A protein has these predicted regions:
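Short loop/turn segments immediately following beta-strands, especially the blade-tip
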Residues: 29-33, 75-87, 130-143, 186-199, ...
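Short, surface-exposed loop/turn motifs with a glycine/proline- and acidic-biased composition
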Residues: 346-379
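Blade-level signature of beta-propeller repeat domains, shared across WD40, Kelch, NHL, RCC1
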Residues: 183-184, 266-300
């Protein structure tokens, strides 16, 4: 049974698979080229060879969270090329924190914007464990650590869910944590070891004429969180389907259920959004679903902008997407005479147009010019692509 996978940052053709009971497999192309077990790694035999999480850090080191007596281990980049028949357990660095031993539902986060690493202890009673190894991988004596069973929120209220389920860093460096009672946000991850450390429970106003508000997805059992190219959060749940919320969490943009969409089940196990196409792949207990969203990863310039479908044929009634844009681009679509038909800002690197003019009528046959500009860049802007519409 596959638990997790991670691609080698230096070789997209090579990836590692964590499993229940069978350790880690190293795959290159379509061939298995390595197998990490109790013979050549810190993994123990039996159920303790479960590896629920595999992560590469910025230096290319391979980190694993696993179910044995150690909890977290790291294989340095320099040792990853050693044949697994010759590798020894001593080639790994082991982080034997007692708080995260025997963590068969572990989730490990190595942030890009902050120092501390985070481990979700997914069993009961749940906790979040943060540690700063200070780069001294051969000892934990100088590490800073903190085990959090209960969080104090921004209003100095104690928050103690039964379970912590998932963890994800967003594009601004804030850390989102899923729990059995809704999500919480760590807005200042580097403050985790300070006495003033707090989490944020996002409030959504009821808009009923009062000052009352409800916590975002209060008491909903969160199973997974994914951050897309526009920093929006896709939040999977155990019983309530899939939510898409705004970047700051203040607005629920969409709620997909088995009743109102093609979601096979309301029990969502995992969500992944392709950063190039914007397609969200949703795993459920009853099968897989796919949904084309309008947010993809932004580009550094306008050199690879394209529209699809293109040409737009007479029988097509859906959205026309322009992708490959810079973040938060101002996009205008005109005809060759300069008449404006559409204007808007991109979600991440993509924007969608319904093929209609500003009065809601389908545009006539012709070539339409797509202009794009970014206020946060000095990159040259202008016509970035063209769309042919045929009626």
């Amino acid at each position: 049974c596959i638990r997790d996978r991670a691609f080698d940052p230096d070789d997209s053709n090579t990836f590692y698979i964590g499993t229940w009971f069978e350790g880690i497999y190293k795959i290159s192309g379509t061939e298995c080229v390595g197998h990490y077990t109790s013979l050549n790694s810190p993994l123990s035999k039996g159920w303790a060879m479960a590896v629920p999480n595999i992560v590469f850090d910025r230096d290319g080191n391979l980190w694993i969270a696993h179910a044995g007596d150690v909890g977290v281990s790291m294989l340095p980049k320099a040792k990853q090329s050693i044949d697994t028949d010759e590798l020894k357990a001593s080639d790994w660095y082991q982080f034997g924190y007692s708080e995260i031993k025997n963590n068969k539902y572990a989730k490990l986060l190595i942030p890009n914007h902050s120092t501390a690493k985070w481990v979700v202890y997914g069993d009961w009673p749940g906790s979040i464990f943060a540690f700063d190894d200070k780069g001294t991988y051969n000892t934990i004596a100088d590490d800073r650590t903190k085990n959090i069973v209960s969080f104090m929120d921004q209003d100095n209220k104690t928050f103690t869910p039964n379970y912590y389920t998932c963890i994800e860093e967003d594009n601004n460096g804030q850390i989102w944590i899923g729990t059995s009672s809704g999500p919480i946000v760590i807005t200042n991850p580097d403050h985790v070891f300070s006495d003033s450390f707090r989490c944020t429970r996002i409030k959504i106003a009821r808009n009923d004429g009062t000052d009352n508000a409800d916590y975002l997805l209060q008491n909903i059992n969160i199973t997974d969180i994914f951050v897309d190219g526009d920093n929006r959060k896709w939040i999977g749940t155990r019983e309530s389907g899939l939510y898409l919320v705004s970047a700051d969490g203040s607005e629920i943009l969409n709620h997909f259920t088995a009743e109102n969409s093609k979601l096979p089940s309301n029990h969502v196990t995992e969500v992944i959004v392709d950063p190039v196409t914007g397609v969200a792949y949703i795993g459920t207990t009853s099968g897989l679903a796919a949904y084309r969203s309008d947010a993809v990863q932004s580009s550094d310039d306008y050199s690879n902008v394209y529209a699809f479908p293109n040409p737009v044929r007479p029988d097509y009634e859906g959205w026309i997407s322009v992708t490959g844009l810079m973040e938060n681009s101002l996009v205008k679509i005109t005809d060759t005479a300069g008449n404006l038909f559409f204007q808007g800002y991109s979600n991440g690197g993509q924007i969608s147009w319904d093929g209609r003019d500003r009065s809601g009528n389908r545009v006539k046959t012709g070539v339409y010019l797509v202009f794009a500009s970014s206020s946060g860049s000095s990159k040259q802007s202008g016509v970035v692509t063209k769309i042919l519409v045929v009626n």
